[in-house]
Structures are given as structure tokens and as C-alpha cells.
Amino acid sequence: MNAIVALCHFCELHGPRTLFCTEVLHAPLPQGAGSGDSPGQVEQAEEEEGGIQMSSRVRAHSPAEGASTDSSSPGPKKSDMCEGCRSLAVGHPGYISHDKETSIKYVSHQHPNHPQLFSIVRQACVRSLSCEVCPGREGPIFFGDEQHGFVFSHTFFIKDSLARGFQRWYSIIAIMMDRIYLINSWPFLLGKIRGIISELQGKALKVFEAEQFGCPQRAQRMNTAFTPFLHQRNGNAARSLTSLTSDDNLWACLHTSFAWLLKACGSRLTEKLLEGAPTEDTLVQMEKLADLEEESESWDNSEAEEEEKAPATAEGAEGRELASCPTESSFLSACGSWQPPKLSVFKSLRHMRQVLGAPSFRMLAWHVLMGNQVIWKSRDVNLVHSAFEVLRTMLPVGCVRIIPYSSQYEEAYRCNFLGLSPPVPIPAHVLASEFVVVVEVHTATRSNPHPAGCEDDQSLSKYEFVVTSGSPVAADRVGPTILNKMEAALTNQNLSVDVVDQCLVCLKEEWMNKVKVLFKFTKVDSRPKEDTQKLLSVLGASEEDNVKLLKFWMTGLSKTYKSHLMSTVRSPTAAESRN
């Protein structure tokens, strides 16, 4: 936990003072703070619970070193400190604990070494013992701001037979810059800090009772002349906390308590990455994976049944079953989850746009988004595979149906991406259809000008690409909104390929949300056409191309989402009609 825990005291001579503080160091110790870690200069203590090992950073100080250290320290001067304002002896550099699990160091000293931290702790100390107090002057309180940090403060009294009112005022504060984290840690900090306070008060009470028993002050108080003015009693106004509790190891114990408090408070609350509901692509992929597993289990079960029926011919039956059982690659191809080869000819949509040219790429992208059949004819199988891998990123997973490479033409209802070898004939009515686009790859007679601009890739310069369709997209046609935004991202050279990919993901999510709204509105609620037109206007998708795109993308919705809506979401009008 990135916080500072400090013990503060209101001195009768000097006002609020910081006695002892513990801070967390994630980075290597600063110069001077870690000098006590060298061999022969560190007093090792026994290993504490939780993997924390404490040591006292004791080193020899020459008079010159002590003077230089005091002059550079952000703390108060020696003349402004009394015995009650000082915790560690002069020349004592403090304590340090090493957390082996997290490689974090917990360092304790009287004041933070960093001037900015010293100022923050000093201000919190003054406020906790002056203006920011709870009723009764004992108890917890919360205060702070964004600039100086947020503070959890718990004030308390320690018995002292020689102090004014027979008690001295202290506070334990925890300072953080994260307000929400500190507020959420309130119950934990309150319970643990109250335990530390109770232990201190218990030790001080025993000393107080012993002093009162040995030297009662009642007669002295009765003989003292009355005066309306406050004055110092005949005693030491600067008694240290170690003398009040009669505990020489007090600061070492406080260090272990504060270090454990910081570690435990940081461990009890952890940040978790909260992901939203799964996307439609994720749901579709999960459904296809479940179908593959179910089909694979059915093949295994049928094979086991054959072996039981004919044990004598089990070997032959197994051979026939293996021959008839589709392989995993065929499963993936059939469900549109085909994986491309390692060799990638087309690197990205931007790369393909450079190779095909802007007009041809726009025509191809328009047909892809509309759900029309895209046919690639080439002898290079890797080229066709890489083209489909790039083009499929424009569509939701549920809308992709790929046959990577076939020896015969397949109908559009079976696939919207079809790879063919050049000799395979395509029916005439398909070539003339406005719902089909064909990309023919020929060997170039001369160097193709487009790949020349593609950085270090010259593998496509030997090809010529001819994009044809029965209904070419007019140059002045507006096209779907997502296509225009996609082309704007592809033409923006200030955007890297990775940024363009993320932009495309955001665009698909935006339009899939519109598809979900339209599906519920039309299929579940069964609203009239007039209301549907108003909805499309609100969605910004009233144009013809946008409507076609939404209807095609609606086929890519997962079965899980559709069944959920159909079973749980019903409109009031539909419920009344059923009743």
C-alpha cells in the first residue's frame, strides 16, 4: 500500500511534532538510506511473520557526518526539539524491513527524508492535533485533499503523572493519495490502530499507577495556591514515550506494527480487471467450440459401439471410422473457424488496399460488408488464404463462412468466402449476379505499380488483380457508414496498423450494438414498419446500404443471445396479445 503511517505528539513546549513514521519503498533505497545494508553494519533481527525481515540500519557516524546529515535533513533543528519531541537517539538511522515476497522495503525514521513527503506528513500532523479532531478529542477522523493527500487520524491520550492534566496527547495517522482506497480501508485501519493504541495506553497506565503509588501528588496539589492561569507543573514537560511506557524496544515494536499494517492493508484490497459481458464474437466462438466437442464425442462414441459389436473385426472397423471421421481442420473450415497458414502474403487491410488500389478495394470491401459472396481465383493457395484472413476481420465472427480452396464452385448459402483454382468454372448466372464479386489473380506481364509502395514486400509484384462484379459499386455511392469510417482510418498514415485494427474492433462493436437493438425491436417486440424506420433514423442507419448491413450482421448474432431475448424479453403488447 502506498501510504505513510506516523505517530504524532502534541508537545507542551513546541506544539505538534512527528515522532515516528514508516513509509514504503518500492524502488531501491536512496543514497544514505541503504548504506546500512552492507555487511558488518546491519544488526539482523529474527525473521518476522509473512516473510518480512527486520534490521536496524546502524552505522558509525563521525561528528562531521552527523553535522552534515542534520544540516541536510528536512526535519526541525535540534534546538527546536526536546526529549518528548524525539523518538530515535541522535545518530540512529532508523529501521528497515525487507519483504521477500514482493521485494518491498518498509523504512522507519522520525521524519521522511524527502522534503515533499516531510511537508505532507508535517501538515497532517498539525491538523490531526489541532483543528481536525472528533468530539471528545479521542477517536478517528478523516480529512485531506488532492494536493496534500488524504489522512486517517486517530487521536488518543497517554497517562503521565508529570504532565498537565496527567495526560499527553498523541495521534496515529495514515496518509494516502488515493481517497477511495483509504475510505474502503477505514474499518481495517480503525481496528488495528485501536489495538496499537490500547497496547500503548496499557503500558503507560502501569507506569502511571506505579508513579502515583510511589509518589502521590494529591497532597502537593491540595497545598498549591489556586491560580486561574495554566502553568507547568513541577516536573519534566518533555518526557519521552519510552519513559512513559517503560519500554526500551518501543520504536522497534512500532516499526514492526506499522510495517505489518501497511503490508496487510495493501494485501486485503486488490484491484481486479472487470470485463464486461462477452462480445458476440466470443459467444459465437464458444458455441462453435462446443459444437466441435459434441461432434467429436459423437464420433468417439460411435467408434466404441462398433468395436463392441464386432470385436473380431475391430481393426477394420477402426480403419473405416477413421477414414470417415472428419479431421479437425475440416471441422474448423466448415464452421468458419479456419486457421491460416504461417506464411502471410497480405499483412493488413491497409496493405491489401495498397495492392489492389483504392477503387478495387472499396468495391471488394463493400461486398464483404453487405454479405455478398467473395470469390478468389488463384493458383497460389497461400495468397487466397491470407486474403481471406485479412478480409474476415471486417465482419463479426458469426457472419464468416469460409471454404478456403475448392475444386468446384459452392453456392453462396454455404460460404461467403470461396477460394477456387483458375480452371474451375463459375456459372454464368453467378458471374452476372450483383451479389457476387470475383477477384482473379493473374501472372503479371510487367511489374505491378501498386506493390512498389509496400515497404519491403515485393512478393505480390508478379501478380495482377482484377476485381469484377455483376453490379459494380458506383463511384458516387455513399456506401455504408462503417465502410467510410474504415477507409478514413486506412488512409490516415498517422495511425499505425495496430491502431487501425483497434479502430476496426470499435466500429464492429458499435454496429453490433445497433444490430442487437434492431433484432429486439423487430424480432422480439414485433414492432410495425413505421416504428422500425424511426428506430433506424435514431440509430443513424436509415440509408439503404446501412439497412442491408444490419440485416446481414443480424445473422451473426449468437444463439445464446437470441434465445435469451426470446425467453426473457417480452414487450407489454405481446404479453397482452398472448393473454
Swiss-Prot record:
Keywords: Cell projection, Coiled coil, Cytoplasm, Cytoskeleton, GTPase activation, Lysosome, Membrane, Nucleus, Phosphoprotein, Tumor suppressor
uDENN FLCN/SMCR8-type domain residues: 86-242
Domain of life of the source: Eukaryota
One MF term in the entry's GO annotations: enzyme binding
Domain cDENN FLCN/SMCR8-type: 339-491
Residues at the site labelled Essential for GTPase activation (GAP) activity: R164
GO process annotations (BP): cell proliferation involved in kidney development; cell-cell junction assembly; cellular response to amino acid starvation; cellular response to starvation; energy homeostasis; epithelial cell proliferation; ERK1 and ERK2 cascade; hemopoiesis
Disordered: annotated segments: 32-82, 294-320
PTM field: Phosphorylation by ULK1 modulates the interaction with GABARAP and is required to regulate autophagy.
Positions of modified residues (Phosphoserine): S62, S73, S302, S406, S537, S542, S571
InterPro entries given in the database record: FLCN/SMCR8_DENN, FLCN_DENN_C_sf, Folliculin, Folliculin/SMCR8_longin, Folliculin_DENN
Locations listed in the record: Lysosome membrane; Cytoplasm, Cytosol; Cell projection, Cilium; Cytoplasm, Cytoskeleton, Microtubule organizing center, Centrosome
Tissue: Expressed in kidney.
Primary residence: membrane
Complex formation: Interacts (via C-terminus) with FNIP1 or FNIP2 (via C-terminus). Component of the lysosomal folliculin complex (LFC), composed of FLCN, FNIP1 (or FNIP2), RagA/RRAGA or RagB/RRAGB GDP-bound, RagC/RRAGC or RagD/RRAGD GTP-bound, and Ragulator. Interaction with FNIP1 or FNIP2 mediates indirect interaction with the PRKAA1, PRKAB1 and PRKAG1 subunits of 5'-AMP-activated protein kinase (AMPK). Interacts with HSP90AA1 in the presence of FNIP1. Interacts with HSP70, STUB1, CDC37, AHSA1, CCT2, STIP1, PTGES3 and PPP5C.
Disease listed for this protein: Defects in Flcn may be involved in renal cell carcinoma.
Family the entry assigns: Belongs to the folliculin family.
Designated name of the protein: Folliculin
Species, as recorded: Rattus norvegicus
